């Protein structure tokens, strides 16, 4: 078990190697967390998530980082530029520094040197983490103030109040831990959790810490400093490109930091969980790093689960939770832990068991307060019945209000509804996604699906369109343009006197309503099942006549053909011409002209 005497004796090259290893370990947290969050939330919503960049979308985070780096870096004219540029740095550096005293594993051997999988440790390691993580809020406050805009300033002020409120509760959780462990060194706290983890001995502290760490990292449902619906983007509204990326990096690294700290303080750090701890050497050497990482990512999953399940709290609810519940309970619990420690020092072995029992009771009391605070208010009194069958409002009769309109059936407690939400999202993760893997797998459309338009032909190849422009007049989006022209004996395109010389449909405007189909008197215009209309430029989304005409079927004659011998215009409209080309003409192969590009 590493202790403080093990630190300070590593060769310089080993200290550098451990620093590089820790930096890479931290950098991997946001890269993996962003992808995992998008994948997990997608599964909760019965989607697939990122699946384009790399195998199964595994390189999506790298692609997003490159894209972010090449975005235009805008600096508004009204900002306080030095502080504006400094704020992202102040936010991200403390997130990395906090990991310096967190033990990732036990003692390992590297090139013949025995060292701890921890960069360093100190007698006040927990206080160091608390102080360093508190510095990060200055970056948020400075970003809001230096942006010179109202929304970022409000986001910065919210963040200040949020961190102050929940930092107190978190510090009291730390106090309970090092009172029980008898040390503030992180390696010593991990050693004090053999064989019983503090999550069982200090259950109220663990519960309060889990709530506080979500508020400390500004994550949903406590993401009030960057509430999109109220503050646009909060404190980083005016940031873009790499400066915005630094704030995102700080957020995800902070998630990893508080998760690693929860693992260290309450879940035994790098020690193996039951029943693996029964295996000799299960947490020796590099195995400890595996257990530590697994516990950290369990907390990271809970962060994502919270985001995918719970809505954002109101600001007054959030502050009331911190000041009226978490802080008073934390103060009471710290006094109880201190009393139990004093009793143990006097030789009363039963104090530990009593502490566990009181902790469970206090946790149940907290849950009860949650239920009471979240219970729906009682239904208002039933309204007095109207004197007549109708009420009159502004001279207009309105129906009477039913007597049970305000009745609430089966009101649920404050925690039961969120728990039901967690059950729903957990069950949805294992359902088959509804995402269609287009274009690799194209699902056939319904038979009556209306997609791209088509100009139809008569059985001998003549066009049905007569250039009447009724379709253009019927289009509510003004997406169709038609120019008619006269047929001649030498150049005939339709059986009648007129044909559509120019026919255009602008698919940037078309809404697919089908009114043009209903307006066509000759059934010349129909809609096909083709839904692939996307293009990379505007010009190609304006379909001309040659792209709208139906392809020539076998037996049809390439335009301009003559009318079938012995037929009149009426024969075409009555359906007397059923197929075959005129004897004087040579049939064209199918698809010779017209159809989709």
From Swiss-Prot:
Signal sequence annotation: none
Binding residues annotated for [4Fe-4S] cluster 1, in chain numbering: 465, 468, 471, 520
Pfam families the record matches: Fer4_7 (PF12838), NADHdh (PF00146)
GO-annotated cellular components: plasma membrane
Cofactor(s) demanded: [4Fe-4S] cluster
Domain of life: Bacteria
Localization of this protein: Cell membrane
BP GO annotations: aerobic respiration
GO molecular function, one term: 4 iron, 4 sulfur cluster binding
Region (NADH-quinone oxidoreductase subunit I): 406-597
Major location category of this protein: membrane
EC number: 7.1.1.-
Domain 4Fe-4S ferredoxin-type: 455-485, 501-530
Keyword annotations: 4Fe-4S, Cell membrane, Iron, Iron-sulfur, Membrane, Metal-binding, NAD, Quinone, Repeat, Translocase, Transmembrane, Transmembrane helix, Ubiquinone
Cofactor note (record): Binds 2 [4Fe-4S] clusters per subunit.
Lipid bilayer topology: Multi-pass membrane protein
Reaction(s) catalysed by this chain's protein: a quinone + NADH + 5 H(+)(in) = a quinol + NAD(+) + 4 H(+)(out)
Family classification: In the N-terminal section; belongs to the complex I subunit 1 family.
Function: NDH-1 shuttles electrons from NADH, via FMN and iron-sulfur (Fe-S) centers, to quinones in the respiratory chain. The immediate electron acceptor for the enzyme in this species is believed to be ubiquinone. Couples the redox reaction to proton translocation (for every two electrons transferred, four hydrogen ions are translocated across the cytoplasmic membrane), and thus conserves the redox energy in a proton gradient. This subunit may bind ubiquinone.
Record-given protein name: NADH-quinone oxidoreductase subunits H/I
Gene source species: Nocardia farcinica (strain IFM 10152)
Top-level taxonomy: Bacteria, Bacillati, Actinomycetota, Actinomycetes, Mycobacteriales
